[in-house]
């Protein structure tokens, strides 16, 4: 029997779905007006934070399309959405906070995003210890030390962001996917949905801390269609009744839509709480859904089946054998290898998108049609 909670949810989602089928009103384009960019998130925008922090590099199969060797620690075959956005505003790729050796400087910003991170605080079972709260704390430490160093030697402004760069910089966020996806392993659908407001309360606390540090320009990505990831389909889609007509797991996408609906509601309220601030909400869900549902129209052959995997169609994915790895599965030694042409695939390794898909998403973001801005700036 459908619960009252589910009934109310379906009504809310109807509004959310109708909202996400078309570009958002009040469009806003990212620009090079911002002197620096500070990014927070998970593997969608991790440019090497987790690998630097835990002391490892992804398999050589990663980053073969663009960065090649030595790999930077991105969980992709090439560039991420954030990389394309930095290119568009003529800024260098963001250097990870924990990266101790690099030819890059931090003058134009810093990346605190770490793969597998959540908005919620990490626990003993978490793969990444760098939850959103930790990332915010890292930023606060980073800013404090940078300004101390510049005060001692002004020449360091050639390599480090000044106070002006911090106060006028753009603060970007792409996080929450792992909170939702991870919850399904131990919780019912109703429990996952009930968790969303708690997750967003924690997110808002991070915004509050950053505002206290002088952040005023916020750029927030909502989460994508989680139910269309091959990993999710492989584990939660064995019962075909749980799949929609596109082969995606309905419950996961339903949770993603509710998360986005409530995140958008929070986005509307934040400028009222924080004077002289500007918040931009970017509808990643609509862009990625369009790509997956209409992949052939955009030159892709496969929307869910992964490029770097094993097992062949329909998913070419084995959760016991990650991209580039060799392992024994069902008594057989197998290797998950990259496909011949990654540009024909939306999904890279079952969890992450290919560079070609990331380029598609970034180009749609840059049109400004999928972003909405709410401001309390005294103009």
From Swiss-Prot:
A GO molecular function held by the record: hydrolase activity, acting on ester bonds
Coiled coil regions, renumbered to chain: none
Gene Ontology cellular component terms for the protein in this record: apoplast
Glycosylation site list: 294, 330
InterPro entries recorded: GDSL, SGNH_hydro_sf, SGNH_plant_lipase-like
Localisation: Secreted
Signal peptide (residue range): 1-27
Assigned EC number: 3.1.1.-
GO BP terms: lipid catabolic process; systemic acquired resistance
First-level EC class: hydrolase
Active-site residues, Swiss-Prot/TrEMBL: 43, 349, 352
Record keywords: Glycoprotein, Hydrolase, Lipid degradation, Lipid metabolism, Secreted, Signal
Major location (coarse): secreted
Family per similarity comment: Belongs to the 'GDSL' lipolytic enzyme family.
PANTHER family on file: GENOME ASSEMBLY, CHROMOSOME: A05, ZINC FINGER FYVE DOMAIN CONTAINING PROTEIN
Record's protein name: GDSL esterase/lipase At3g05180
